[in-house]
Every structure is written in C-alpha cells, then in structure tokens.
Amino acid sequence: MTVVVVTGTDTGVGKTVACAALACHARQAGIEVAVCKPVQTGTQIGDDDLAEVARLSGVTELTGLVRYPQPLAPAAAAEHAGMALPTREQLLELIAGLDRPGRLILVEGAGGLLVELADASATLRDLAVELGALALVTVSVELGTLNHTALTLEALTTRGVACAGLVIGSWTGRPGAVQISNRSALARLAPMRATLPAGAGSMDATDFAAMSAAAFDRDWVTTLVH
C-alpha cells in the first residue's frame, strides 16, 4: 500500500491545495489516485476540502469519515457538536480499504501533524506510523516557518516517519527578503518538492492542471508508487 499523509506546519498554509496539486500531477502522469480526508471540520461555514480537491484535481476517488459543523480542531468540534471522535481503528480501516495495486493514496490531516484526529489522542503521525506512510509537509515562507518546520520534521523523525519533502503552499509573485531567505533555508531542512503560487486554489481546473504538472518533478512522483 502506497500512502502519503499530507500535513502542514500550521492551519492555513495550503495543505488542501498541496494535496490537490500532487493528486492532479499524479493523475496526469497516469497514476491512479485516491484522496482521503478522514476528519472534516467547519462544515457549517462551507469548509469541504474533498470537494475542493475534486474541483481542482479532477480526482474522483474521494473518501471521508466524519464531518463536524464548527471550524475548530477535531476534538473541540466533536465535543461542541455532541459527537464522538472516530476510533483509530476506524481511520486505519477506511484508509486500508482504498488500497489497490499501483494506486497512490493521499491522506490529508486536519491542522498540524500532532492534532488529535481520533480517540485516545491518536494523531496523523500515529496513522502514518501504522500505515508505513511517507509525510509531505506543507510550509509557509513567512517569519516563524523555520522553527515550525524544524519541529514538524523532528516530530516525524522521533517516530520513524520518513519525510517525502516540503511544499510551499503559497509563493507570492513579488517575494521580499524574508520569503526568499526562508525558501532557501527550508530547502536545507528537507527536499523542496514544489512551490505553489499564491492563489492557486482560485484557479480553474485547466490552469490548475497546468500549474500542477509543472510544479512537481514527475520522476519523483512516479517513485512514490510501489
């Protein structure tokens, strides 16, 4: 089973767009792709990451498990709604059920790597450990990103989860000294797999497909599937 968990150093750094871009690139490379967003919050304000991935990437194999109305961390959103978090076993079974020969499974978390997604404080990192998954980390280029990224990479390393690389979720067309410096420093922490333009999530499907095709190295993407 080939699983890549897509996480981020913070909320709002572009995980969903990064997930959609990788899914779109892989689809265009002839790889069968499934995208899983086990836990979705914020449905009452229209948050629907799987719908966004579908619109941008053209991938049709999309799977989720639980949806909470409030735009809060999953544990808080579940409590607010009077609902339970899923169990770790439910999440693992959901993801394992997507396995097919030659298929790439992308699993998008909620918030950062160590946000509780299931009961008993299970996190995306825990799922990655049990699935033998790689982790693709979506990052910012603003102040604070170097510490946030280093902490995320350290959290992966301590549990033996291999980092597939970094994706800059939003790169402005007119970067300043901070953004340029941080981009160079981030590339020294882990392989930089893609730099996505600011506003990519607002592109139509045709423009997004062209952007995604150019953003990632196809040879690297094809090595993900085994």
Swiss-Prot record:
Q: Does the keyword Nucleotide-binding apply?
A: yes
- Its domain of life? Bacteria
Q: What class of enzyme is it?
A: ligase
Q: Which Enzyme Commission numbers does its entry carry?
A: 6.3.3.3
Q: Which residues form the active site?
A: 37
Q: Binding positions for substrate?
A: 41
Task: Supply the alphabetized keyword list.
Answer: ATP-binding, Biotin biosynthesis, Cytoplasm, Ligase, Magnesium, Metal-binding, Nucleotide-binding
In the record, biological process GO terms are: biotin biosynthetic process
Show the catalytic activity. (7R,8S)-7,8-diammoniononanoate + CO2 + ATP = (4R,5S)-dethiobiotin + ADP + phosphate + 3 H(+)
| Residues holding ATP | 12-17, 49, 108-111, 169-170, 197-199
Q: Which cofactor does it need?
A: Mg(2+)
Q: Which family, according to the similarity comment?
A: Belongs to the dethiobiotin synthetase family.
This one is known as ATP-dependent dethiobiotin synthetase BioD
The subunit field of the Swiss-Prot or TrEMBL record says: Homodimer.
Where found, per UniProt? Cytoplasm
Q: Where Mg(2+) is bound, by residue?
A: 16, 49, 108
Record-level Gene Ontology MF annotations: ATP binding; dethiobiotin synthase activity; magnesium ion binding
